[in-house]
Design a protein with these regions (language model features):
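Membrane-interface loop-to-helix entry segments
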Residues: 6, 37-43, 47-50, 180-188, ...
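Loop-to-transmembrane helix boundary motifs in multi-pass membrane proteins
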Residues: 1-11, 169-178, 213-232, 236, ...
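N-terminal alpha-helical transmembrane segments of multi-pass membrane transport
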Residues: 1-120, 486
């Protein structure tokens, strides 16, 4: 597919340059990042804030009631299971890398104020919360919302380009749409590569502490090959159940590590600072969202930290967004947005606060070695801090093992997402072929290794800032596409209230008087009864109407197989929204009051069936059983007139 070849060629060319000319490539990347932070740093801050505002306002508005799926879809997972999966999405190996090194760096090298003071410590935690807070999950929510909404409600491909359908229509399946997916894949590869790079440095430091394995490029390349090889093996071997169990155990170990640091360390102080950190973060969030240090502060600080973080979150958005979209079908936009924003955020901020304040407490108490390590070798800072706790060697061993498993599970998921987006970018349920997982895993390993050779942490950050820039523009177009689609949803609802026919409950559509109507209401038909009704009454009605529509010159597609439990009429309107009238046979358990009236408990498992009407947006929750052919034709025309009213409103 064009998406695969375009993305693969560009990424491989970049990897070849970085590996072939590592020193010069590192200089180019650093110069480009400096240019980007000085030239478009303001844009990154503005864009990330707009993403967050958009998803929150959408959730709080009337659009928040819209489902990510058809109107009759129910969530696939219980709320508790869904929350657990969102919780897992908030944990990655980078939490281990930055939870100690970042707050100590801000403490010792603050963008404003005097270093090494209580005020510097407070500012450090505020900046840490900013970088790991709502903004990042806002961009994840935006991408996941777009993917789920267009795939599950409008049956478009589960691809990034689908969000532009309201803007460019069927051209999403042409060069414009393929370019969108291509940029998304490129951003994801470099975001995943940065994550893997930080993970390799973190694991190398852990092995150095435990077994004196040195920090060298050959060792790091060996770790990349080992861990990516494990991830690819998991991705292609079909041992999903086993890796899920391992991942669950790993999350329990991570939570145990968090509780260990909380209760073995200065517990009261850590709880106090957690609450204060949350208050400082929320209180200063609006101002910090736009703080460019335009009136003072190190010129390169913003590019190395906030701009990098915003670019990194953007790069990870297709990866995490696709995962969240797949587990969120059937949820309303309101519960989806607030679940995505706050469930994983709670754990992330608790982790950062407890580890960050533990490190700051040691630094303020005179731990000069910890401060030195945080600046000179950030990947070793966590282990240096844990060295001051009881059973430090055992705790650090567990930390290294947990980090390794998080690396493997993240890389495994990343290769699956990349193969899905590049193979077809279409099926909402199927992943890409296994060979593509091997390919993208290998390419990501090449990119990671090349960037580590080209300049380690600085090169990783620079590549992310540059490759995320085009995709950040696409996210703004996604917002526009979603807004336009939601507006059309509201107009569709408005059109329903403008029916040109009388209300069904009051126009005598059910013939035979009130006694027959009552008998029909308390009758619970069998499967065979509904089959006969659909074959003898519904099918002729749809057939007759479809012939008339064809005579009028409209594009009609009627599915009238009498052996199928589904009959449908579809009318095309060119580039405008199609009209779909579908009758589906649906089965339900007979209610208890009816079972009692039909002879008692021996009928408790009896099912009854309905001939339900579905439109393009899903079930309309009413049953046609008992209607005559003329009444069904009138109902089709009622719905078609509502559809024409909707098309009129959105022109």
């Amino acid at each position: 597919p064009p998406v695969f070849y375009g993305a693969a060629i560009l990424i491989l060319l970049f990897a070849a340059v970085v590996i072939g000319f590592p020193q010069r490539a590192g200089e180019w990347l650093l110069a480009a990042q400096t240019w980007a932070s000085q030239t478009v740093g303001w844009y990154y801050l503005l864009a990330m804030t707009l993403y967050l505002i958009f998803v929150v306002v959408t959730a709080l508005s009337g659009y928040g009631k819209i489902k990510l799926g058809a109107d009759h879809d129910e969530p696939e997972f219980s709320y508790l299971s869904w929350a657990g999966m969102l919780f897992a999405a908030g944990i990655s190996i980078t939490l281990f890398f930055f939870c100690v090194s970042e707050p100590l760096t801000h403490f010792l090298q603050p963008p404003q104020g005097e270093a090494g003071t209580q005020e510097a410590a407070r500012q450090a935690m505020e900046l840490l919360f900013l970088h790991w807070g709502l903004h990042g999950w806002g961009v994840f929510a935006l991408v996941a919302m777009a993917l789920a909404y267009f795939a599950y409600r409008h049956n478009l491909p589960l691809a990034l380009r689908s969000a532009l359908y309201p803007l460019i229509g069927k051209r999403i399946n042409g060069p414009i749409g393929y370019t969108v997916d291509c940029f998304g894949i490129i951003a994801t590869v470099f975001g995943l590569g940065a994550d893997m790079g930080f993970g390799v440095l973190q694991l190398n430091s852990g092995l150095d502490y435990l077994y004196a394995i040195p920090h060298t490029h050959p060792v790091q390349m060996a770790l990349i090959v080992l861990m990516m090889g494990a991830a690819i093996s998991v991705a292609v071997s079909g041992v999903d159940k086993g890796i899920r169990i391992l991942s669950d155990i790993n999350m329990l170990l991570a939570c145990s590590l968090l509780l260990f640091v909380l209760f073995v360390g200065p517990t009261q102080h850590l709880l106090n600072t957690l609450v204060q950190n949350v208050g400082d973060y929320l209180g200063h969030l609006p101002g910090k969202s736009f703080d460019l240090y335009a009136y003072g502060g190190p010129s390169d600080w913003l590019g190395s930290w906030t701009v990098f973080y915003w670019a990194w979150w953007i790069a990870w958005a297709p990866f995490v967004g696709l995962f969240i979209a797949r587990i969120s079908r059937g949820r309303t936009i309101r519960e989806f947005v607030f679940g995505v924003l706050f469930i994983p955020l709670g754990f992330t901020l608790a982790w950062m606060s407890i580890f960050g304040n533990s490190a700051l407490e040691q630094a303020l108490g005179g731990a000069s070695e910890l401060s030195r390590v945080a600046i000179e070798q950030p990947s070793m800072a966590l282990y240096q801090m844990l060295q001051n706790y009881p059973w430090s060697r055992a705790v650090i061993t567990v930390t290294v093992l947990v980090s390794f498993v998080f690396f493997v599970t993240s890389a495994d998921s990343g290769t699956v997402v990349l193969s899905t987006l590049s193979a077809h970018g279409g099926s909402a349920d199927d992943d890409g072929p296994k060979w593509l997982r091997v390919f993208w895993g290998s390419v990501t390993a090449l990119v990671t290794g090349g960037l580590l050779f080209a300049g380690s942490i600085d090169a990783l950050k620079s590549a992310v800032v540059l490759t995320s820039l085009p995709f950040s523009l696409i996210l703004l177009l996604m917002m526009w596409g979603l807004h336009k689609a939601f507006y059309m949803e509201s107009q569709r609802q408005r059109a329903r209230s403008h029916s040109l026919a009388p209300l069904m409950s009051g126009n005598g559509k059910r013939s035979g008087g009130w006694k027959r109507r009552l008998s029909q209401a308390v009758h619970f038909p069998s499967r065979d009864e509904v089959y006969r009704f659909m074959n003898d009454v519904v099918r002729p009605a749809i057939s007759e109407v479809s012939e008339v529509f064809r005579e009028k010159g409209l594009a009609v597609d009627a599915q009238l197989d009498p052996g199928n439990a589904s009959l449908s009429l579809e009318i095309g309107h060119g580039e405008q929204h199609r009209f779909l009238y579908q009758v589906l046979m649906r089965g339900y358990f007979t209610p208890s009051f009816a079972r009692a009236g039909m002879g008692g408990l021996h009928l408790k498992n009896r099912r009854y069936f309905r001939a339900e009407v579905h439109l393009a947006e899903g079930s309309q929750d009413y049953d046609l059983m008992g209607y005559t052919k003329e009444q069904i034709i009138n109902d089709m025309l009622d719905q078609y007139e509502r559809h024409l009213q909707f098309l009129h409103l959105v022109r």
